[in-house]
C-alpha cells in the first residue's frame, strides 16, 4: 500500500484490490482518491507476481526521461511516450549533475537499492547500459521503495560513448575500480560528477573504465576484496552529497 501511495495519481491507469483488502481497509481507496476494481482473492492471487500479495495492484503509465533529466538540467520531470511534457514545479531548479552510471548491472535488488540510495543522496539521475536489468522488473520496483517514481533514469546502447559525452560536457567521470590509484574521499565532487559502477561479478568492462577521467577505489580492511555494487554506489554518492552540503 505504501508504494501505491507514492505513485503520482495521474500515472495510475488502473487499480485493483482484493476482497480481503477492501474488507480490512474500507476507507483506504476513498482516501487514495483513485477508483479501484475489486477482485476475488483467488483472481487477485492469479494476477499478482508474489506468493503472498498485499491485496492492492496498480497499473502505472511508463514515463520516458531524457539525458537532460538525468543531468538535472531539465525543467520538465519527464517525457511521456505520447510526447507530452509532464510539468513538475518542484523540479524546475537546475541542479549540479550527480549521476550514477551502471554497466551491465544484473541483480534486481541491487538496482532497486541504488535507486533508493540515489534519491536519498541527492543524485540527479541514473544512466544504465542497455544490457542491465530492467528497471520495470517487479523486484526492482519493490526494492526502490517508491524512488523509481521520482528518480530519472536512461538506458544507452553505447555506454563508453555516453561516458565520453558526459566528460565533454564538463562532468568528471569516476570509475569505481579495484586498481584505482586515487582514494574516493580525496576527490572533489562539488562540481558535476558521475560515478561508474560495474557488474556484480566482473566489475566495469575495460572499454567503459578506460573512458573514465579517473579511477577511484574505496579502501577496505580485512580480507574483503570488493564491495557489493549497491554498497559501493552508496559510499560514493553519499560522499558527493556530504561535500555539497558544506
Predicted regions and their residues:
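General small-molecule cofactor/ligand-binding pocket signal
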Residues: 36-40, 154, 216
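RNA substrate-binding interface of SAM-dependent RNA methyltransferases
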Residues: 1-10, 17, 73, 79, ...
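N-terminal positively charged helical leader segments and presequences
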Residues: 1-51, 79, 83-87, 92
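Short, acidic/turn-prone active-site loops that include or flank metal/cofactor-
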Residues: 20-22, 41-44, 131-133, 200-202, ...
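Acidic/glycine-rich phosphate/pyrophosphate-binding loops and surrounding catalytic core
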Residues: 49, 56, 60-73, 91-94, ...
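Structured adenosyl-cofactor binding patch, chiefly the S-adenosyl-L-methionine
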Residues: 117-121, 135, 140-148, 206-246
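Glycine/charged-rich beta-loop-alpha catalytic/anionic-binding loops adjacent to active sites
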Residues: 70-72, 95-101, 211-220
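Active-site/ligand-binding-proximal alpha/beta "capping" segment
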Residues: 174-224
Amino acid at each position: 500500500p505504501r508504494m501505491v501511495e507514492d505513485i503520482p495519481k495521474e500515472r495510475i491507469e488502473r487499480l485493483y484490490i482484493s476482497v480481503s483488502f477492501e474488507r480490512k481497509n474500507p476507507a483506504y481507496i476513498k482516501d487514495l482518491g483513485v477508483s479501484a476494481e475489486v477482485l476475488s482473492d483467488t483472481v487477485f492471487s492469479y494476477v499478482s507476481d508474489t506468493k503472498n500479495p498485499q491485496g492492492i495492484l496498480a497499473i502505472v503509465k511508463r514515463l520516458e526521461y531524457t539525458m537532460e533529466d538525468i543531468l538535472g538540467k531539465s525543467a520538465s520531470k519527464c517525457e511521456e511516450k505520447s510526447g507530452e511534457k509532464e510539468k513538475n514545479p518542484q523540479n524546475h531548479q537546475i541542479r549540479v549533475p550527480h549521476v550514477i552510471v551502471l554497466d551491465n548491472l544484473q541483480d534486481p535488488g541491487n538496482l532497486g537499492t541504488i535507486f533508493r540510495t540515489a534519491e536519498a543522496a541527492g543524485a540527479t539521475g541514473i544512466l544504465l547500459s542497455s544490457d542491465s536489468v530492467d528497471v520495470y522488473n517487479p523486484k526492482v520496483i519493490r526494492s526502490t521503495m517508491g524512488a523509481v517514481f521520482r528518480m530519472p533514469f536512461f538506458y544507452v546502447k553505447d555506454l563508453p560513448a555516453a561516458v565520453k559525452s558526459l566528460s565533454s560536457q564538463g562532468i568528471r567521470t569516476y570509475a569505481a575500480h579495484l586498481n584505482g590509484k586515487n582514494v574516493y574521499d580525496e576527490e572533489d565532487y562539488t562540481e558535476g560528477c558521475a560515478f561508474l559502477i560495474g557488474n556484480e561479478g566482473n566489475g566495469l568492462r575495460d572499454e567503459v573504465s578506460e573512458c573514465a577521467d579517473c579511477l577511484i577505489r574505496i579502501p577496505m580492511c580485512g580480507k574483503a576484496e570488493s564491495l557489493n555494487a549497491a554498497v559501493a554506489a552508496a559510499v560514493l554518492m553519499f560522499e558527493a552529497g556530504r561535500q555539497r552540503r558544506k
